[in-house]
Amino acid sequence: MRALAYFGKGNIRFTNHLKEPHIVAPDELVIDIEWCGICGTDLHEYTDGPIFFPEDGHTHEISHNPLPQAMGHEMAGTVLEVGPGVKNLKVGDKVVVEPTGTCRDRYRWPLSPNVDKEWCAACKKGYYNICSYLGLCGAGVQSGGFAERVVMNESHCYKVPDFVPLDVAALIQPLAVCWHAIRVCEFKAGSTALIIGAGPIGLGTILALNAAGCKDIVVSEPAKVRRELAEKMGARVYDPTAHAAKESIDYLRSIADGGDGFDYTFDCSGLEVTLNAAIQCLTFRGTAVNLAMWGHHKIQFSPMDITLHERKYTGSMCYTHHDFEAVIEALEEGRIDIDRARHMITGRVNIEDGLDGAIMKLINEKESTIKIILTPNNHGELNREADNEKKEISELSSRKDQERLRESINEAKLRHT
């Protein structure tokens, strides 16, 4: 099977010979992949990993699967085959995948020495998104969506409405990350929010906050192209490089409703300066949420910035089925706009060119790229996109011609009056 696979730190490459996945457990299904987004975690696995992947020569604790594995966990596709225990999905359904691999999924790998291992405390209590052995389909547990096909159990698959294009459906997983953060902090409609960092998760948080009834959203982001995109998605924007950190914090607090800071802040950058800004830009009793993935290193912050104002600071990890279902419902109801969501996609590349044409581009050109999605192009997806772009350009040209014609007619009328 063709795939863009992880062989180890700094070693991602295309292969024609990845092992074809097959149904093992009765509730599994085969998904024909159309699109799969590249996540920041994928980039970190390349530059700093392995993080979720096992070390070379080792296997994953949940599945006992070794390297190499196809990367990619933001996937959308069509059901190709179903196991005898699949109840609610059928061949031909469009689906997205919740890619977590946890204690609850051990049964899928009956040959693993850990198949009967006791569940961790978090999984026992239903908090499987913070499983002690958490991995991802496409990042350690099993091969993911930078491949032609994936096998997944039905409980991790969600049907997508027919009107949602599969390139946008590939954004449902990162949007579920954002939705989970809003749920974790118990966001209240009518509140105000500051987002620090306008990468894919920061931009997705704009969409999730709008859907949740946020009154006012401000985004702090140094890159011009990302600020412009945040504006298109309905946020006010600020360039933090315009002033020193203290002046930026004072200014951001002043432009919040009431002039005394925001009800909620979302740190999507993961730097010492952004963590402290997220706390200090809160109003009293506000809540700061960390969505960023940090390295395991210590930083400095003042606990009294929290205590004196009875503020809260919390983390948010992954998602659960509630978040996938909520995002799909918001798309169905129009609370998340498909066209606005599609603004996040800045590139479409086939898996053969995924390393140089996408992963390295995201690493080296952060200011001009947001989200690149990959495809095995089994059904001419890239050709379809090219045809759609030509059609849009043609329609735009036609509209401009019509506008010019109307202007000429109006000018002629004015000359004869």
From Swiss-Prot:
Keyword NAD: yes
Keywords noted in UniProt: Cytoplasm, Metal-binding, NAD, Nucleus, Oxidoreductase, Phosphoprotein, Zinc
Keyword NAD assigned: yes
Cofactors that this protein relies on: Zn(2+)
Entries under SUPFAM superfamilies matching the protein: GroES-like, NAD(P)-binding Rossmann-fold domains
Primary subcellular site in the record, as a coarse category: cytoplasm
Phosphoserine, modified sites: 63
Cross-referenced PROSITE patterns: ADH_ZINC
A GO BP annotation: butanediol biosynthetic process
Compositionally skewed regions (Basic and acidic residues) per UniProt: 381-417
Binding sites annotated in the UniProt record for Zn(2+) 2: 120, 123, 131
Sequence similarity: Belongs to the zinc-containing alcohol dehydrogenase family.
Protein name as catalogued: Probable diacetyl reductase [(R)-acetoin forming] 2
Source organism of the structure: Saccharomyces cerevisiae (strain ATCC 204508 / S288c)
Gene it is expressed from: BDH2
